[in-house]
Amino acid sequence: MPNEPALLYGSTLNPPPTELANTAAGEAGRPAHQRWAEFGPQAEHYELHAAQREGWVFNPAYPPQPVWTFQAAVADLSVLSPVVHSHYGHPMICRIYNDLPANHTGFGTPEISTHLHNAHVGSESDGFPGDYYSPTKAGPSLTAPGGFKDHLYSNIYAGYDELQNGIGDYREALGTLFYHDHTLDFTAPNIVRGLMGFFLLFDHLDSGNEKDPNPAALRLPSHPYDYPLSFCDRRFDPNGILYYDQVSPEGILGDKTIVNGKIQPVLRVARRKYRLRLLNGGPSRFYQFYLVRPNNVIQPFTYIANDGNLLDKPLLNQTNVRLGVAERADIVVDFSRYPVGTELYLANRLTHRPEDTRRPYQVVAPGEWVLKIVVDREPPEQDLSQVPANLRPLPPLPTTAQLAALPVRKFLFERRQNMWAINGQFINLNTPRALVPMGAMEIWELYSVDDGWDHPVHIHFEEGRLLSKTTDGRNVAIAAHEKGRKDVFNITDRTVLRVLMRFRDYKGKYVMHCHNLIHEDHAMMLRFDIV
C-alpha cells in the first residue's frame, strides 16, 4: 500500500466546459448546469477516466487481472482511483470520460453515472441513476449518448441562498466524500469491479494544513498523514479471479476484505498522529473495527467525524467504529505512543451468519485482521498537528414547537415479491414520489417491519439530523457519534428513525435508496424532486 494517497491534480479541459451540454463535441446530453454564471466560468478543471486497467494484483497470491477504475489523465498505477482534494469557495468542473470497453467480459455494464456522495450540487451533476452514458448509449434521463460528461461541483455550503454571504453555512461543511458509479440496476457490479474513489473537501476550519497559521484552523493531521481507507468485501473464484453473484437479490458477503484494492495490505506509518478516514464501500457487509496489538489488546483512538462530517467535539479514548454500507468515520490515531517496530492491526469483529446478509450477527474476538499497520520510522519533522477540544459547531435544532409544525413524510422499507420496495413501490425514475419545495425543512420518518433486515438508507443532496430512534415504540438512545450530521441512516427491525432534512439552493431530481448495493439494484429506491 502506498505510504501517501495518490492525488488528482487539475488539468486544462479541451473543449472548454459549457453551460449547455456540448453534444457536438461528444458530451452526453445532460440538462443545463444550474447556477452556471455564478460558478462555471471561474471553476477549476479536473478530469477522470473510467477505464479498464489490466494486471491489477489484489495480493501476491492472486493472479494479475483486469479491474475497472477511475484514472487521472496520466494514471497512477499504484492505486485503483486517485483521491480528489478540493476546497469550499473554489468551484470545480470534473469531466468524467467513459473509456470502458464496450464489449467487456464478465459482470457489470460499460455505462456510468458518477455520484459524488453526498455533494451539495445541482441534480444534473449528482449522478442520477438514469443519467448513465457511454459513447453509444444514453440513460432515460439524458437526451444523447456521449464519451464524457461535465460535473459542476460548486463547493458551497448548504444555506447559500438563505444566508446571502457568498458561501453558505460553514457549519454544514462536508469533509470525507467518495465518488462512485450509480448506474441504474448496475451500481453493485460496477463498484465491485472498482469504480469508486475518495473526494476530500476542505475549508478554513478543516483546511488540510496542519501548519495553517490561521488561528481558526483546526490543524488536524494533513496530507500525507491524512489517509483515506476503503473497506470492501469481495468474492474470488478458485483461481483467484474476482467473482460476482449476479443472481441473489438479498446481498453479497465476500470471502476476503480488500483495503484500497488490496487483500491484507500493510500501511507503514511514522511515530506521529494520523487521520484515518474509514469508508465501508460495500456491497452488503457491516463492519465493527478495532485497533489491536498482535496479542489482540485493544488500542484507543479519537473519533472526530461521522459520515464525513466533523463532530462538534472529538470523542476521546474510543475503542471501536461500526459502519454500515457507505458510512464513514474519521479517526485520529497517535502513533507516537509506540516505538519504531511496533505492529498493529485493524480488526473487524462484527460477524454475519454464513451467507446471511440480513443484518450483523454478533461481535466476536479476535475477529479478522484486515489491515496491518507498522510503525517503521521517526517523523521527518515535528508533528504540529492537533485535535482541539472543539471541532465544527452544529447548526441549532428547531425548538420543540417548531419541530411539531413541520411536515412529516413516512417511508417504509420492506421486501416485496422477492425485490425491495419503499412504501410498497419499486423504483420508477420517470415519476417523483415526493415533491419538496426548495428551501423546505421537513421530518422524514424511515422505518421497517419485522422482516429481519437492516437497511442503511442514503438520502442524496443534503445531510440530515437524527432526531429520535424508537424500537417497538420505546425510545433508543442516540449514540454520541450519531448526534452530528449524517447522510446514511441504518434502519433495523421495528425501528423508526425521525430525520430532520433541509432542501436548499438547487432544484431537480434526486434519489433516496438503501445503500446495501444489492437492494439498491433490486428497486429499493425512490425519486424525489426539489421544486
Protein language model regions, located:
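Short acidic/polar inter-strand loop motif in beta-rich domains
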Residues: 185-191, 350-357, 518-524
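Divalent metal-coordination and catalytic microenvironments
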Residues: 48, 94, 114, 181, ...
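Short, surface-exposed ligand- or partner-binding patches at beta-edge/loop junctions that are enriched
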Residues: 168, 172, 177-180, 336-352, ...
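Short, hydrophobic/aromatic beta-strand segments
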Residues: 59, 102-113, 193, 285-292, ...
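Histidine- and aromatic-rich segments of cupredoxin/plastocyanin-like copper-binding domains
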Residues: 121-143, 231, 235-389
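A conserved hydrophobic secondary-structure block that centers on an alpha-helix together
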Residues: 90-92, 143-190
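Active-site pocket scaffolds in enzymes
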Residues: 61-65, 110-145, 149, 298-319, ...
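N-terminal, post-signal-peptide metal-ligating segments of extracellular/periplasmic oxidoreductases
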Residues: 1-135, 148, 246-276, 310-313, ...
